[in-house]
């Protein structure tokens, strides 16, 4: 599965909300990212505090049916942790089901949401 389109937004309320609003515009797999997210949110409706210019906010849109969608947050956590270790030598820990910690501090939060379309 390869990414068909990546969109950069200088500022965005929420990358997840943007993808949900523009979902039909993406091909099978698309992505959007920003360095300034002004209305981020986490699981259970919690807010996600923005660190403008010091973080990357990224959402992937997958239009392909997933055999086991409930495993996506776990797989995403493992994939991001693996890439941080391989590419940057960052050895972080997974706080199941959706956070990555470095020295006890959260450095990644993963939020997976479904969208009905078609």
Role assignments for model-derived ranges:
Residues 1-89, 106-109, 113-116:
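N-terminal lobe of the biotin/lipoate ligase/transferase fold
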Residues 102-103, 118:
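Short secondary-structure boundary/hinge segments and terminal tails
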Residues 94-96, 101-102, 111:
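Glycine- and Gly-Pro-enriched alpha-helical subdomains that act as flexible
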């Amino acid at each position: 599965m390869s990414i068909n389109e990546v969109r950069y937004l200088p500022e965005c309320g929420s990358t997840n909300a943007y993808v949900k609003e523009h979902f039909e515009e993406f091909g099978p797999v698309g992505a959007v990212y920003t360095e300034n997210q002004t209305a981020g949110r986490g699981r259970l409706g919690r807010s996600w505090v923005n660190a403008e210019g010091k973080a990357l906010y990224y959402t992937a849109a997958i239009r392909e049916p997933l055999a086991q969608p409930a495993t996506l947050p776990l797989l995403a956590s493992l994939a991001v942790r693996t890439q941080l270790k391989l590419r940057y030598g960052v050895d972080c820990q997974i706080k199941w089901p959706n956070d990555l910690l470095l020295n006890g501090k959260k450095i990644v939060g993963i939020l997976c949401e479904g969208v009905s379309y078609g």
